[in-house]
């Protein structure tokens, strides 16, 4: 870091000796505290972070590390001595620790004995007990953050994620911080940091020390965290079948899925372990599962210690060739000889494991770029909220082995050949400049163009992707509720809208896109462009209801039933015009029948069958003139025509026969039409009164003509007296009265002949 060249002074007190390591968040230097005359480690924040858009978040975390660690006095916690700001960059002054971290030892040994494991756990719990008493929750306990100093004792480092227990909930940035393989379920689900969460991480770490692997492992970090949330940690005895049940029970107590099922804090867990140790038989202490060392030092930079130059490793690029390397002595607790207590366990335990090689590691900040070989990566995942900005992935790499030259440092006062002294400072400066330039460039690329500039669309757990298939892996069919939790956990911004689907079940994903382009597994969502994942979620098959009044000819739905069904949302309405029927009562176009019944709720694509009315049937008027009334009624009734009957006298048509109709034969009518029909009453009759004989001609004539008859007279002897002697109609004698036709067949008045004397 060019801001702090070797031999440079910070605040007139701390003289930089050399660059120990580079991280994604800060550079760590070995320095001399000129005031107290002791070696310290100084962590200085990178310029691009201190002046970047997320400065406040990084500075908050940087200062939190100082405040959290400084508030705890415990030999098992790396101490922070001082903090400040130099040239606009925050820095921490920390204890300079000689040793290695636990990850290095785990990689070297593979597995540990119960004795070795419980010793590390006991000292870790002691340190956490002090932290918990001070109201501080670490939040990122893992092997990378557990240092084994050169005296063989545990020291916990990296309190950059720590928070006060009273405030250990979702941070203002909405970020979930921690290492996926060791995170407690409540941290994953609610970002709720608890003392019990630290114990859960200790339990997972112990599980890994004994078995050589973590209980949950997956290449997909989302799958990993969901296993922690939804599955119980299996008993360590499932792998270490010869382990003492009380040890397995203790680890199970630490790793219980429910918060309340774990010890309350570090002190309670330490007391439980103390009671366990007092009763544990000798052979139980010696148990060790055989496992091959992982090989290589893949120590996580997030959790490495501030370590002194107690050993050298293969040099980094740029370090002068020929730098000496050597292995330090094994840490005390790992080298203790227990051979005198050897018990034959049938080969199940290795009571005297070989001393592992050790190498120095250097405490970097939690943003060190990831080592590709790291099996358990720290994940940074944002909670819901579209405004949340996810910071560069913190602490997801394993600390790289760093080599330090055993030649005199440029800041030392050692004497040597002048020629060597003139070259070495230049080489070291060039190395520092090149390494820092590379790291700075890499960090810049990572954040602005590389993986830090985008999110990758995660694979749903319930979707199977064929790695050998040429087609892309779609999100379609995945359960949205589960996948939404995944997006929230990863901090991926998203929006949804719901649609009905005939093929995709309710609550499942129909499609996904980013910036209107189809999104599949591993598609990129740009942070720089403020992109978000758009997910279309199925509401299932659309349901709709047949209107209850659809058969009511007087309702709006009844008058146009097909359109009513369309408006209701039915897409599969079956109407066959050839099956429509004529109806006397139902107007044309109104539904006669519908299946299913009105008021039924069904899928929008279910078949709905409708039969419409064609209205009254057209008919042809029959010829009914001259028909009897019964014959007329039968003819019209068959055609569903209505007869309006009237009667009248007719001198030509017999009584009871049809004289006429209002509609001519052959006229086009329809069912229900009315026809006016005139029925004959036959010829009109008139009654001639009796007593006409003997009356005067004039009076009788007047009476008969008044009835409508035509009167003729036949006078005898000239009708001298003018009186009526007989009354006749043709041959019919009506002198005594009688009833006769008023007219003849031609409509002429009937002639009445009077004989006058």
UniProtKB/Swiss-Prot annotation:
The active site is at residue 140. One of its GO terms (molecular function) is protein serine/threonine kinase activity. It holds the Pfam family PASTA. The keyword Thylakoid does not apply. Residues 14-274 form the Protein kinase domain. Its EC number is 2.7.11.1. Residues 344-387 are annotated as: Disordered. It catalyses: L-seryl-[protein] + ATP = O-phospho-L-seryl-[protein] + ADP + H(+); L-threonyl-[protein] + ATP = O-phospho-L-threonyl-[protein] + ADP + H(+). ATP binds at residues 20-28, 43. Keywords: ATP-binding, Kinase, Nucleotide-binding, Repeat, Serine/threonine-protein kinase, Transferase. Residues 466-539, 545-614, 615-681 form the PASTA domain. It is an enzyme of class 2 (transferase). InterPro entries: Kinase-like_dom_sf, PASTA_dom, Prot_kinase_dom, Ser/Thr_kinase_AS. The keyword Kinase applies. Belongs to the protein kinase superfamily. Ser/Thr protein kinase family. This is Probable serine/threonine-protein kinase pknA2. It comes from Bifidobacterium longum (strain NCC 2705). The lineage of its organism: Bacteria, Bacillati, Actinomycetota, Actinomycetes, Bifidobacteriales. The gene is pknA2.
């Amino acid at each position: 870091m060019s801001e702090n060249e070797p031999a440079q002074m910070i605040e007139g007190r701390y003289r930089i000796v050399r660059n120990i390591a580079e991280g994604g968040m800060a550079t760590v230097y070995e320095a001399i505290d000129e005031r107290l005359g002791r070696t310290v480690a100084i962590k200085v924040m990178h310029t691009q972070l201190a002046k970047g858009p997320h400065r406040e978040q990084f500075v908050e975390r940087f200062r939190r590390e100082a405040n959290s660690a400084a508030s705890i006095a415990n030999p098992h916690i790396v101490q922070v001595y001082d903090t400040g700001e130099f040239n606009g960059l925050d820095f921490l002054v920390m204890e300079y620790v000689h040793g290695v971290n636990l990850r290095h030892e785990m990689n070297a040994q593979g597995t540990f004995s119960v004795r070795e494991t419980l010793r590390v756990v006991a000292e870790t719990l002691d340190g956490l007990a002090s932290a918990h008493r001070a109201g501080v929750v670490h939040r990122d306990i893992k092997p990378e953050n557990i240092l084994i100093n050169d005296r063989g004792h545990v020291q916990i480092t990296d309190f950059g994620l720590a928070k006060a227990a009273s405030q250990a909930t979702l941070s203002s940035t909405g970020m979930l911080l921690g290492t996926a393989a060791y995170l407690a379920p409540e941290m994953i689900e609610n970002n709720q940091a608890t003392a019990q969460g630290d114990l859960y991480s200790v339990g997972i770490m112990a599980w890994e020390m004994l078995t050589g692997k973590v209980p949950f492992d997956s290449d997909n970090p989302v799958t990993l965290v969901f296993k922690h949330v939804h599955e119980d940690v299996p008993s360590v005895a499932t792998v270490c079948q010869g382990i003492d049940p009380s040890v397995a029970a203790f680890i199970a107590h630490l790793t219980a899925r429910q918060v309340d099922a774990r010890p309350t804090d570090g002190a309670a867990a330490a007391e439980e372990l103390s009671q366990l140790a007092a009763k544990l038989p000798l052979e139980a202490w010696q148990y060790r599962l055989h496992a091959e060392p992982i090989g290589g030092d893949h120590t996580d930079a997030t959790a490495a210690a501030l370590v002194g130059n107690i050993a050298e490793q293969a040099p980094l690029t740029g370090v002068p060739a020929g730098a000496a390397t050597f292995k330090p002595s094994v840490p005390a607790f790992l080298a203790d000889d227990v051979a005198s207590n050897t018990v034959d366990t049938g080969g199940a335990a290795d009571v005297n494991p070989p001393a592992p090689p050790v190498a120095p590691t250097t405490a970097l900040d939690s943003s060190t770029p990831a080592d590709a070989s790291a099996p358990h990566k720290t994940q940074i995942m944002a909670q819901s909220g579209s405004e949340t900005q996810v910071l560069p992935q913190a602490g997801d790499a394993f600390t790289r082995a760093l080599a330090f030259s055993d030649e005199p440092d440029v800041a030392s006062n050692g004497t040597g050949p002048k020629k060597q002294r003139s070259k070495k400072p230049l080489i070291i400066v060039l190395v520092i400049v090149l390494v820092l330039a590379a790291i700075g460039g890499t960090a810049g690329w990572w954040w602005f163009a590389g993986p830090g500039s985008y999110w990758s669309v995660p694979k749903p757990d319930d979707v199977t992707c064929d790695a050998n298939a040429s087609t892309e892996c779609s999100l379609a069919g995945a359960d949205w509720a589960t996948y939404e939790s995944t997006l929230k956990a990863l901090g991926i911004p998203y929006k949804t809208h719901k649609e009905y689907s005939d093929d995709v079940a309710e609550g499942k994903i129909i499609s996904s896109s980013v910036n209107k382009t189809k999104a599949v597994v591993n598609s990129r969502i740009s942070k720089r462009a403020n992109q978000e994942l758009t997910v279309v979620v199925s509401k299932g098959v659309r349901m709709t209801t047949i209107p209850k009044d659809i058969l009511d000819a007087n309702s709006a739905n009844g008058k146009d039933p097909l359109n009513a069904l369309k408006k209701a949302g039915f897409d599969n309405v079956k109407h066959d015009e050839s099956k429509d029927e004529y109806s006397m009562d139902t107007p044309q176009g109104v539904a006669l029948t519908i299946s299913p019944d009105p008021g039924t709720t069904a899928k929008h694509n279910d078949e709905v069958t409708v039969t419409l009315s064609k209205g009254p049937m057209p008919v042809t008027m029959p010829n009914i003139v001259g028909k009897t009334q019964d014959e007329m009624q039968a003819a019209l009734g068959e055609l569903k025509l209505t007869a309006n009957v009237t009667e009248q006298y007719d001198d030509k048509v017999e009584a009871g026969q049809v004289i006429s109709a209002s509609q001519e034969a052959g006229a086009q009518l329809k069912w229900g039409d009315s026809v006016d029909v005139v029925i004959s009453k036959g010829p009109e009759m008139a009654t001639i009164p009796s007593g006409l004989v003997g009356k005067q001609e004039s009076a009788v004539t007047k009476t008969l003509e008044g009835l409508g008859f035509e009167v003729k007279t036949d006078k005898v002897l000239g009708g001298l007296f003018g009186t009526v002697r007989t009354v006749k109609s043709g041959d019919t004698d009506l002198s005594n009265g009688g009833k006769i036709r008023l007219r003849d067949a031609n409509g002429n008045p009937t002639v009445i002949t009077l004989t006058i004397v």
